[in-house]
Amino acid sequence: MLVNDHKGRCVFVYNRTQETFVATEARVADGYFSRLIGLLGKRRQWARPGQGLWIVPSHGVHTIGMLFPLDLVFLDSKKRVVHVEEHVRPFRISAVSLKAYSVLELPPHTIFRTGTQEGDQLEIGPMAGQGEGPPAPDGRADVLKSGVPK
């Protein structure tokens, strides 16, 4: 299964196509309650660049009860981007993508900043200290000199 390796953890999200990090610290929501609650009631401080929530499985989300807008990236089971929605305001319902297996909820402007678009291939992996290898000094995933995650 796609998320068993990341259960109850934070992950990094790297866009291999655009060669940029989409999120350096995305929480995994793969249980009933974690998917149900998601980011409801979270304050705007959550929406800093690099933050995120990876909802697995999911074909769509809503922002009812949200306090700030979100960018949404819909991924298939191979972590390829199948749909994006920018700046989804609170109290809205996103599109439903039957091609999607999971959804990334990201701070506003992340899609624009990273150039993420349909067809991009993402890599999602454990943050340093939660998987193999030594943690990086800043607590983020180790990165090769080329900028590609290990």
Question: Whereabouts are the PLM-identified features?
Answer:
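Compact, glycine-rich, soluble single-domain proteins
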Residues: 1-150
